[in-house]
Amino acid sequence: MTEHISSAHVPTGSVPATWYADFFTYLPNEFWRRAATEQWTAADVDFVESRLGLTAGSRILDVPCGSGRHSLALAARGHRVTGVDLSTEAIAHARAVAHARAVAAAAGGTVRFEHGDMRDLERHGVFDAAICMGNSFGYLDLAGTRAFVDAVARAVRPGGGLVVDFGVTAESILPGFTGEANTMVTGDITVVANEEYDAEASRLISRYRFSQGARQLEATAIHHVYTSGHLGDLLATAGFTDVRRHADPDGTPFTLGSGRLLITARRR
Protein backbone atom coordinates (compact mmCIF):
# COMPACT_ATOMS: atom_id res chain seq x y z
CA MET A 1 0.00 0.00 0.00
CA THR A 2 1.03 3.62 -0.33
CA GLU A 3 0.95 5.44 3.00
CA HIS A 4 1.33 8.95 1.64
CA ILE A 5 2.61 10.60 -1.50
CA SER A 6 4.37 13.92 -1.02
CA SER A 7 6.16 16.19 -3.49
CA ALA A 8 8.81 13.71 -4.57
CA HIS A 9 8.29 14.13 -8.29
CA VAL A 10 7.28 17.77 -8.64
CA PRO A 11 9.74 20.38 -9.91
CA THR A 12 12.16 21.73 -7.35
CA GLY A 13 10.54 25.17 -7.33
CA SER A 14 7.16 23.62 -6.52
CA VAL A 15 8.24 21.87 -3.31
CA PRO A 16 6.13 23.52 -0.60
CA ALA A 17 8.01 25.66 1.92
CA THR A 18 6.13 23.87 4.68
CA TRP A 19 7.18 20.40 3.51
CA TYR A 20 8.01 19.45 7.11
CA ALA A 21 4.35 19.68 8.15
CA ASP A 22 3.51 16.45 6.27
CA PHE A 23 6.88 14.73 5.94
CA PHE A 24 7.32 13.23 9.41
CA THR A 25 4.85 10.37 9.34
CA TYR A 26 5.44 6.78 10.45
CA LEU A 27 7.98 5.55 7.87
CA PRO A 28 10.47 8.46 8.06
CA ASN A 29 10.15 8.63 11.84
CA GLU A 30 10.51 4.89 12.34
CA PHE A 31 13.52 4.73 10.04
CA TRP A 32 15.37 7.37 12.07
CA ARG A 33 14.27 5.84 15.37
CA ARG A 34 15.98 2.63 14.32
CA ALA A 35 19.01 4.33 12.79
CA ALA A 36 19.87 6.36 15.90
CA THR A 37 21.67 4.02 18.29
CA GLU A 38 21.69 4.28 22.08
CA GLN A 39 25.44 4.93 21.91
CA TRP A 40 24.88 7.85 19.53
CA THR A 41 22.24 9.35 21.81
CA ALA A 42 24.40 8.88 24.91
CA ALA A 43 27.31 10.67 23.25
CA ASP A 44 25.07 13.58 22.29
CA VAL A 45 23.69 13.87 25.82
CA ASP A 46 27.18 13.65 27.33
CA PHE A 47 28.16 16.56 25.09
CA VAL A 48 25.14 18.64 26.09
CA GLU A 49 25.66 18.07 29.82
CA SER A 50 29.40 18.65 29.81
CA ARG A 51 29.61 21.59 27.41
CA LEU A 52 26.73 23.47 29.02
CA GLY A 53 27.73 22.52 32.58
CA LEU A 54 24.27 21.24 33.44
CA THR A 55 23.49 20.25 37.02
CA ALA A 56 20.81 17.78 38.14
CA GLY A 57 17.31 19.15 37.75
CA SER A 58 18.17 21.57 34.93
CA ARG A 59 15.19 22.76 32.91
CA ILE A 60 15.82 21.85 29.28
CA LEU A 61 13.89 22.67 26.11
CA ASP A 62 14.28 20.14 23.26
CA VAL A 63 12.92 21.68 20.05
CA PRO A 64 12.03 20.14 17.73
CA CYS A 65 12.30 16.92 19.72
CA GLY A 66 11.24 14.38 17.08
CA SER A 67 10.48 11.04 18.71
CA GLY A 68 12.06 12.22 21.95
CA ARG A 69 15.29 10.27 22.17
CA HIS A 70 17.31 13.18 23.57
CA SER A 71 14.48 14.33 25.84
CA LEU A 72 14.05 10.85 27.29
CA ALA A 73 17.78 10.38 27.83
CA LEU A 74 18.16 13.76 29.55
CA ALA A 75 15.16 13.12 31.79
CA ALA A 76 16.59 9.74 32.75
CA ARG A 77 19.66 11.63 34.00
CA GLY A 78 17.56 13.74 36.33
CA HIS A 79 16.70 16.79 34.24
CA ARG A 80 13.32 18.45 33.74
CA VAL A 81 12.70 18.33 30.01
CA THR A 82 10.06 19.76 27.68
CA GLY A 83 10.02 18.40 24.13
CA VAL A 84 8.16 20.24 21.36
CA ASP A 85 7.51 18.94 17.85
CA LEU A 86 5.07 19.45 14.97
CA SER A 87 4.81 15.73 14.09
CA THR A 88 1.80 14.17 15.80
CA GLU A 89 3.19 10.70 15.08
CA ALA A 90 6.53 11.51 16.71
CA ILE A 91 4.94 13.12 19.79
CA ALA A 92 2.58 10.15 20.24
CA HIS A 93 5.52 7.76 20.03
CA ALA A 94 7.57 9.78 22.52
CA ARG A 95 4.71 9.91 25.02
CA ALA A 96 4.15 6.17 24.70
CA VAL A 97 7.82 5.40 25.31
CA ALA A 98 7.96 7.74 28.29
CA HIS A 99 4.91 6.04 29.79
CA ALA A 100 6.20 2.53 29.12
CA ARG A 101 9.57 3.25 30.69
CA ALA A 102 8.20 5.34 33.55
CA VAL A 103 11.11 7.47 32.49
CA ALA A 104 13.10 9.51 34.98
CA ALA A 105 11.12 8.51 38.08
CA ALA A 106 14.12 7.01 39.84
CA ALA A 107 16.49 9.79 38.82
CA GLY A 108 14.13 12.59 39.81
CA GLY A 109 13.78 13.96 36.29
CA THR A 110 10.61 14.73 34.39
CA VAL A 111 9.66 14.84 30.73
CA ARG A 112 6.64 16.11 28.88
CA PHE A 113 5.97 16.31 25.17
CA GLU A 114 3.98 19.05 23.46
CA HIS A 115 2.68 19.30 19.92
CA GLY A 116 3.62 22.64 18.39
CA ASP A 117 5.60 24.69 15.88
CA MET A 118 9.28 25.29 16.70
CA ARG A 119 8.76 29.05 16.28
CA ASP A 120 5.84 29.26 18.71
CA LEU A 121 7.42 28.94 22.14
CA GLU A 122 5.27 30.93 24.55
CA ARG A 123 7.76 30.87 27.39
CA HIS A 124 10.06 33.56 28.65
CA GLY A 125 13.29 32.85 30.50
CA VAL A 126 12.15 29.58 32.05
CA PHE A 127 14.75 27.16 30.66
CA ASP A 128 18.34 26.66 31.76
CA ALA A 129 19.23 25.31 28.32
CA ALA A 130 17.77 24.54 24.90
CA ILE A 131 18.84 21.97 22.34
CA CYS A 132 18.06 21.71 18.63
CA MET A 133 19.38 18.38 17.42
CA GLY A 134 19.31 16.36 14.21
CA ASN A 135 19.52 18.88 11.32
CA SER A 136 16.15 20.49 11.98
CA PHE A 137 17.75 23.94 12.19
CA GLY A 138 17.73 24.03 8.38
CA TYR A 139 14.06 23.20 7.82
CA LEU A 140 12.97 26.83 7.69
CA ASP A 141 13.88 29.64 5.32
CA LEU A 142 15.91 32.57 6.62
CA ALA A 143 12.92 34.47 8.02
CA GLY A 144 11.61 31.35 9.72
CA THR A 145 15.04 30.50 11.11
CA ARG A 146 15.35 33.99 12.58
CA ALA A 147 11.92 33.60 14.17
CA PHE A 148 12.94 30.25 15.65
CA VAL A 149 16.23 31.56 17.07
CA ASP A 150 14.43 34.56 18.57
CA ALA A 151 11.83 32.27 20.17
CA VAL A 152 14.53 30.07 21.70
CA ALA A 153 16.39 33.14 22.96
CA ARG A 154 13.25 34.32 24.75
CA ALA A 155 12.69 30.89 26.26
CA VAL A 156 16.20 30.52 27.72
CA ARG A 157 17.13 32.46 30.86
CA PRO A 158 20.08 34.88 30.81
CA GLY A 159 23.25 32.82 31.13
CA GLY A 160 21.46 29.69 29.93
CA GLY A 161 23.00 27.41 27.30
CA LEU A 162 22.20 26.35 23.76
CA VAL A 163 23.30 23.45 21.56
CA VAL A 164 22.52 23.39 17.84
CA ASP A 165 23.28 20.23 15.84
CA PHE A 166 23.47 20.80 12.08
CA GLY A 167 24.89 18.65 9.30
CA VAL A 168 23.97 20.85 6.34
CA THR A 169 26.31 23.81 6.61
CA ALA A 170 27.92 24.88 3.34
CA GLU A 171 31.28 23.77 4.76
CA SER A 172 29.89 20.27 5.35
CA ILE A 173 27.98 19.41 2.20
CA LEU A 174 29.48 21.37 -0.68
CA PRO A 175 33.07 20.02 -0.73
CA GLY A 176 32.87 16.98 -2.99
CA PHE A 177 29.09 17.11 -3.44
CA THR A 178 27.97 14.71 -6.18
CA GLY A 179 24.24 14.18 -5.71
CA GLU A 180 24.60 10.43 -6.25
CA ALA A 181 21.77 8.18 -5.07
CA ASN A 182 22.23 6.63 -1.66
CA THR A 183 20.51 3.53 -0.28
CA MET A 184 20.10 2.99 3.47
CA VAL A 185 18.64 -0.05 5.23
CA THR A 186 17.60 -0.57 8.83
CA GLY A 187 15.72 -3.76 9.61
CA ASP A 188 12.93 -4.16 7.09
CA ILE A 189 12.89 -0.47 6.09
CA THR A 190 14.83 0.60 2.99
CA VAL A 191 15.36 4.21 1.95
CA VAL A 192 16.65 5.40 -1.41
CA ALA A 193 17.70 9.05 -1.32
CA ASN A 194 18.51 11.35 -4.24
CA GLU A 195 19.91 14.80 -3.53
CA GLU A 196 20.36 17.92 -5.61
CA TYR A 197 21.70 21.34 -4.70
CA ASP A 198 19.62 24.37 -5.59
CA ALA A 199 22.35 26.99 -5.99
CA GLU A 200 19.94 29.85 -6.63
CA ALA A 201 18.20 29.40 -3.26
CA SER A 202 21.09 27.70 -1.37
CA ARG A 203 18.96 24.65 -0.58
CA LEU A 204 19.61 20.93 -0.45
CA ILE A 205 16.68 19.06 -2.02
CA SER A 206 16.41 15.44 -0.80
CA ARG A 207 13.95 13.08 -2.50
CA TYR A 208 13.24 9.87 -0.61
CA ARG A 209 11.54 6.57 -1.31
CA PHE A 210 10.82 4.65 1.90
CA SER A 211 9.84 0.97 1.64
CA GLN A 212 8.66 -1.48 4.29
CA GLY A 213 7.13 -4.50 2.65
CA ALA A 214 4.02 -3.36 0.79
CA ARG A 215 4.11 0.02 2.51
CA GLN A 216 5.85 2.74 0.51
CA LEU A 217 6.28 6.48 0.85
CA GLU A 218 7.74 9.04 -1.51
CA ALA A 219 8.56 12.39 0.05
CA THR A 220 10.80 15.40 -0.43
CA ALA A 221 12.72 17.34 2.20
CA ILE A 222 14.41 20.73 1.99
CA HIS A 223 17.36 21.90 4.05
CA HIS A 224 18.33 25.54 3.76
CA VAL A 225 22.10 25.74 3.66
CA TYR A 226 23.92 28.28 5.81
CA THR A 227 27.59 28.88 6.37
CA SER A 228 29.05 28.36 9.80
CA GLY A 229 29.66 32.10 10.04
CA HIS A 230 26.07 32.89 9.09
CA LEU A 231 24.78 30.65 11.86
CA GLY A 232 27.00 32.42 14.36
CA ASP A 233 25.64 35.80 13.20
CA LEU A 234 22.04 34.58 13.57
CA LEU A 235 22.70 33.46 17.14
CA ALA A 236 24.57 36.64 18.05
CA THR A 237 21.78 38.84 16.69
CA ALA A 238 19.26 36.95 18.84
CA GLY A 239 21.30 37.54 21.99
CA PHE A 240 23.62 34.56 22.23
CA THR A 241 27.33 34.87 22.94
CA ASP A 242 30.37 32.63 23.49
CA VAL A 243 29.59 30.75 20.26
CA ARG A 244 31.81 27.69 19.86
CA ARG A 245 31.94 25.11 17.08
CA HIS A 246 32.65 21.38 17.25
CA ALA A 247 32.57 18.59 14.68
CA ASP A 248 31.84 15.74 17.07
CA PRO A 249 30.60 15.16 20.64
CA ASP A 250 34.20 14.40 21.61
CA GLY A 251 35.01 18.09 21.05
CA THR A 252 36.85 17.82 17.73
CA PRO A 253 37.05 21.35 16.20
CA PHE A 254 34.78 22.08 13.24
CA THR A 255 36.67 22.63 9.97
CA LEU A 256 35.99 22.63 6.24
CA GLY A 257 34.66 19.20 5.28
CA SER A 258 33.47 18.22 8.77
CA GLY A 259 30.27 16.25 8.35
CA ARG A 260 28.55 17.74 11.36
CA LEU A 261 28.48 21.05 13.21
CA LEU A 262 27.70 21.19 16.94
CA ILE A 263 27.39 24.79 18.10
CA THR A 264 27.30 25.77 21.75
CA ALA A 265 26.37 29.27 22.95
CA ARG A 266 25.20 31.22 26.00
CA ARG A 267 22.22 33.54 26.37
CA ARG A 268 23.59 37.02 26.93
Regions found by a protein language model. Name each.
Residues Y226-R268:
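C-terminal lobe and adjacent flexible extensions of AdoMet/dcAdoMet transferase-like proteins
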Residues D120-A129:
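A short acidic, Gly/Pro-enriched loop at the edge of an enzyme's catalytic core
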Residues M1-S58:
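Conserved class I S-adenosyl-L-methionine
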Residues R146-P158:
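A short glycine-rich, Lys/Arg-flanked "PGG" loop and its adjoining helix->strand segment in the class I
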Residues R69-D120:
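Class I SAM-dependent methyltransferase SAM/SAH-binding core
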Residues P64-G68:
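Class I SAM-dependent methyltransferase "Motif I" SAM/SAH-binding loop
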